[in-house]
C-alpha cells in the first residue's frame, strides 16, 4: 500500500520499521518539529524523523495541520492510508478524510480505557491487571474511533514502563501489519464502536507527579517508581537534596510516614513501607541503596521529605 506514517517518539519507530519491512510504500513521514535538547540545547530530530531520514523517506514537520496549505499538501500525497502512532498533533477532519482508507491509529491501551497521551504509565499507576494495543479507525475525537483490532497483555507486580513500552511497540508493529494485510485482501476487520462504559483518560505526565508522598500506600509508591522512570523520574527530599528512586520494593513496616525504620533505608508509608533498592543522587551515577548508605548514612529515625 501507498501510505503516510505519522509518529514522533521511540514507541513509533518499530511500527514504522514493520511497515517498511512488510513491503508497504511509505511515501512520506510526518513527525513533530526538531526541538532543543541536552545541555547544549541543540535542536534534535525526533526518533521517528531520524529513522526516516536514515531510510531516505521524506519527512515533514509542521507545527500544526490546521492551516489549509498543510491540509492541501497532505491530500496531494494521495495515500491509500495513513498510519498514526503517538504523533502528538490533532488531525483535522480534512486530514482524516484525505487517504482512501482514512487514518488508522496504533494506541497503547485497551480502549476506551486510557484515551490520551500517557496510556502506558497510567495503566501501571492504576494497578491495572492488563493493558494492550488497539488499532482504531480515527475520527475527530480524542481516541474515540471504532476499533479494528485489540490485543491484551497481562501486567505483573514488577512490570516497568520501559519494559511495557517495548512490548507494546512490538505488539502494535505486528498488529498494524496484520490489519493492513486484511484491508489489502478486501477482508477488512469489523469496525466495533467503543463502548460508552469504562472510558478513562491518560493525562499527560507532569514533573511534580514524581515526588514520593510517604502518606500514601507503599503499593501506590512502588507503582510510581515502576511507571514514572525514566521520565519524569521519582524522588524524595533529604536535607535539601533530591534523591531519585530507580527501583524499590514494598515491605512490611509501620511508623510515622517518611520515617526511616532500619539501616536498609526502609521508609514508613501511610500503609506498609517502601525500601528503595536503586537510587541516584544529584550529579552521581545510579547506585544501589546500600552503596549510597555506605558513603552517606541515613540513620534510623530520620524523617524524610
Curated annotation (Swiss-Prot):
Record GO terms (molecular function): methionyl-tRNA formyltransferase activity
InterPro entries reported in the protein's UniProt record: Fmt, Formyl_trans_C, Formyl_transf_N, Formyl_transf_N_sf, Formyl_transferase-like_C_sf, GART_AS, Met-tRNA-FMT_C, Met-tRNA-FMT_N
Positions with a binding annotation for (6S)-5,6,7,8-tetrahydrofolate: 109-112
Catalytic activities: L-methionyl-tRNA(fMet) + (6R)-10-formyltetrahydrofolate = N-formyl-L-methionyl-tRNA(fMet) + (6S)-5,6,7,8-tetrahydrofolate + H(+)
Family, as annotated: Belongs to the Fmt family.
Keywords: Protein biosynthesis, Transferase
Domain of life: Bacteria
Biological function: Attaches a formyl group to the free amino group of methionyl-tRNA(fMet). The formyl group appears to play a dual role in the initiator identity of N-formylmethionyl-tRNA by promoting its recognition by IF2 and preventing the misappropriation of this tRNA by the elongation apparatus.
Enzyme class: transferase
Organism of this sequence: Paramagnetospirillum magneticum (strain ATCC 700264 / AMB-1) (Magnetospirillum magneticum)
Nucleotide-binding among keywords: no
A GO CC term assigned to this protein in UniProt: cytosol
Listed EC numbers: 2.1.2.9
Name this polypeptide is given: Methionyl-tRNA formyltransferase
